[in-house]
Amino acid sequence: MSNLSFAQREDSSYVMVCRGGGIWISRDGLSEYNQLTDRRVYPDVKGRFEDPVIWRDHIQYHLIVNDWLGRIAFYLRSKDGVNWVTDPGEAYMPGVAVHEDGHSEGWFKYERLKMYQDKYGRAIQANFAVIDTLKHEDKPFDNHSSKNISIPLNPGLLLTVLNDKPITAGTKTIRLKVQAEEGFHPQTDMDISSLRFGASEEVNYGRGSKVLKTENDGDDLIITFDGKGNGITENEFAPKLIGRYKNGKMLYGYARLPYVDYVEPILSARAPVFSESQKGWNGNIEVQNFGQVSSQKASVKIEYKKEGKMVKVASAAVPALKPYEKADIRFATKADFEKGEDYNFLVTIYSGKKVLSTFRLNRKVVE
């Protein structure tokens, strides 16, 4: 593996992303890393991906990955560091190094991104390796060069949603507190009429909830938004504020939702192992909780795909598991596996009818 990037979780464990886009977790950063994903978490587009960088702030996990051939990077967000959503647009591309006076640095390629964070975990500075031509055209004693450059970032605002009940399409009003910081005074620095709040899919395109009124709260500002058009669904974990400062520059920020659990169990299964006896086929499968809190009882189902249809192999109960605890689950199956045939297995872990995780693998049961 290469191009590894790490973020520390709340319990001091670590989540890691590798160049291939797999997500791994280690209990302390020194013990073994276990891969939880069976496919890359990057956007489902063609690209030569490398140099992923992952970090966690007080709201969520962030991930940027670079397509070195296309010279474009993508930005993803996650509640738990395992399941990711991709934001539209580009995280960066040639032309992003622009000074306050308008001068633009014409670097050909930006790579090896690293983030400098503040005490909240917010990214406040991006460090890049840059070059002004193709690598193989940068020769000794020529006029080309590569450098390390640092670009200051807009860290985003500190926001708190004050609604106690879940926000839906029917929510009448949304109350949001904007916290004052050194150098930022929300009561005087924001263009209030420009503010929009809601799901990223809405506010990124100029939609979202509009301001109804504001009220001062010490040095902070409480903004009441009309709930109409917020776009927040049951899967939302970090709604977004976007708008302008009075000086015309962009402002933004993410907020947590007070009714969402941000630290949950993360159940993951290993590949099932089968053995044949006189009575038929038996199997066992290991399920481990990589979450930071205990899990409830769950279930696991094993299937394989044949002629376009899913064939059930077995299902079994998964006991409640403490953080990092594992269970070896045994089962019997009426399935009859053929010698030399490849099986496309799907392992699904459920909590009731809710899918917690899936794991796909292709393997022969009988050589």
Description of each model-found segment:
Residues 1-160:
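Carbohydrate-active catalytic/glycan-binding domains of CAZyme proteins
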Residues 152-165, 260-280:
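Low-complexity, acidic Ser/Thr/Pro/Gly-rich terminal tails and inter-domain linkers that flank the onset
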Residues 170-175, 191, 234-239, 278-284, ...:
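Short, solvent-exposed loop/turn segments enriched in Ser/Thr/Gly
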Residues 203-254:
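Structured beta-strand segments within beta-sheet-rich domains
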Residues 243, 334-367:
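Terminal connector regions
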Residues 286-292:
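Asparagine-centered strand-capping/turn motif at beta-strand->loop junctions
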Residues 292-298:
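Short acidic/proline- and small/hydrophobic-mixed sequence motifs that coincide with surface turns
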Residues 309-338, 349:
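Intrinsically disordered, low-complexity Pro/Gly/Ser/Thr-rich segments with frequent PxxP/GP/PP motifs
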